């Protein structure tokens, strides 16, 4: 449905490694006791930046674990550490990602995913510790605020207003991490996003999802903050996958944090599956 490429050399009966580009993998799916999101990885440019980041975590008293050579080999990187954000989300930080010698070929003839210099897409977490998590990503991880959305997500005027912090790292993608003031879902993640090169590929993916009886969590729509044309579908792990096209890439030297009061210009009517 999504059109990723299985890395045959790395995958086995317990692990599925999925490619989006020249990287050996961008997603790893493994057998576990629960169907849910596990952890996300963030890349720094080089060993010097990696050592600076680990020193900053140490100086701030934030616990982290050096994962060693064995896991680094599995992750196809030079070195990595792991730690948690204040919401309990497990994160990894690494440098020196390997390049796969084999050409990327989409399983669904997708011309390409928009990843180069941008990462796999974005992740949006739900937590009741949203302020602490926001401070962590902006002050410790040194992300920047792209957009802050404050709105009521139900028609009930008595329901409290929620907030979503959309944050960017050191690349042009509008946001790499979102933090929503909401209970952490059982899946551990609200949604992940992948981006393709044409609107037609978004519509084709929605058709494939429907044909394969994948629950469509949201209709097609155009987001206000990053201008992404997309739809959302439910994954077997329980979180949503946003499949999009045409997200903006701001110039961070001139960008000023925006304040949204609605998620979309049009569309994106959500229909969540029954628990």
PLM features per residue range, with description:
Residues 1-25, 125-174:
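Core segments of cupin and vicinal oxygen chelate
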Residues 1-80:
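An N-terminus-focused feature that recognizes amino-terminal "leader" regions
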Residues 4-7, 28-32, 39-43, 93-94, ...:
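A structural feature that tracks compact, well-ordered secondary-structure segments
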Residues 10, 32, 71-75, 155-159, ...:
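A short beta-turn/loop motif at secondary-structure boundaries
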Residues 31-128, 163-168, 184-210, 213-275, ...:
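Vicinal oxygen chelate
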Residues 37-42, 98-132, 144-146, 187-194, ...:
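N-terminal beta-strand motif that seeds the catalytic metal site of vicinal oxygen chelate
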Residues 157-224:
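A compositional/structural signature marking long, glycine- and acidic/polar-rich segments
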